[in-house]
Structure formats: C-alpha cells, structure tokens
Amino acid sequence: YQWMIVVMAAIMNLLDGFDVLALAFTATAIRGEFGLTGIELGYLLSAGLFGMTAGSLFLAPLADKIGRRPLLLMAVSLSAIGMLGSAFISQYQWLGFWRVITGLGVGGILVGTNVITSEYSSRKWRSFAISVYAAGFGIGAVLGGMFAVMLQGEYGWRSVFLAGAILTGLLLVVLFIWLPESIDFLTSKQPKNAEVRLNLIAKKIGLSSDWKLPAKVEKVKSKLPISQLFSEKY
C-alpha cells in the first residue's frame, strides 16, 4: 500500500513533466498556426511557469487548512482542465490563460506530493522512495517529448494537449479512489472522522488498527510584518 502511494506520487510528477513541457514540444507548430513573434511565444512559455510559481506560493498554505488530499485532487483537476482548454483554443491569448491554469495545478501538485511521499515511505526505504518520486518529472519530460512527436505527426499539436488532459483526468479518478490523507494533517488538525481514517490507513499498512488521536494542540498565531525581515535583527 505504501509503495502504491509512492507510485501515484511519481505518476503525478511524471505527468507534471509532460504538462509543463507540452508547450515546448508544440511551440513550432503553434507559432506557425498563429503567426507568433518570438516575444509572443516567449510570453506563452512563461505563462505556465508563472502559474507554477503562483500555485506553489498560494496553494501550499491551503493544504494546511483543507488537507493534502483535497489539495492534490484540486490541483490535478486544474491541470487537466488547463490541458483540455489548451487543446481547443482559437486565439493564442487563450492559450496563455490555460497555461496559467495548468501551471497553478502543477504548482499545487509539487507542494503536495513530496509531503505524501515522505510520510508514507518507511524509514528504511524513504530515500529511495523520494528518489523514485523525484525522477518522475524528468521521465515525464523525456517520454513526453517522444510521445508528443508521434502524436503531432499523426494528429497535430492539439492532440498533445488533449492526450495530457485525458491522462491527467484518468489519474484524477485513481487518486480519488485510492489516495489517502496526510497522517500529519489527520493527527494535528483532526478533521471529522480523523480517528476512523487513521485506523483504516494503519490497517492497510499493516499496523495495529487501534490508534487514538492525541490531544489537539491549539497553535498560537503570530504575525511578522514582512518589513521586519529587512531590519537589523535579521
């Protein structure tokens, strides 16, 4: 069960590699169809990276409120929607919009999968499991490039984005069925049915299924103005 979770995280990372570089794989065909200048193409290529940055910055804090599982399901959904929208554009400006949406999803996936992988890996195999997960992005980029060449040759550049949307959508179904919540989130935030969910997880990974939730500790919130980071104290 633990390795299944690691494999799911690696596949998410693999599809991230494909989704992020899909525009690079199809840039020549898109530039030819819409008559783009180098600057316009550069904006499109940057749109996905902008979305990734925004997703990493703004979706990461959301995981502490709603949980890693809902965050990952939402992020994978955004990625699938962005890829699907990219396949049916009629103006290149819309491609920029959908690339931002895809990037948001990819950024959210990146901040969620590393935590899930680390938590569900055994101490003995944790380093190897994280390596497998991390390798997914590069493998997705390499295999995605070869896959994109074949698709474009037969069906055109839009098929690359459509294939990415379909694969990401299938992954979403798999995650919805089998992806568990973060153990740390269940024990620290203690959402509804947290104890039941923890015991189900424990049973699946071969542990005694009689876990009890620890006393919930309320964290004292403290705010530090950003300006203080530039003071002499720091």
What are these regions (language model features)?
Residues 1-234:
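Transmembrane-helix signature of 12-pass secondary carriers
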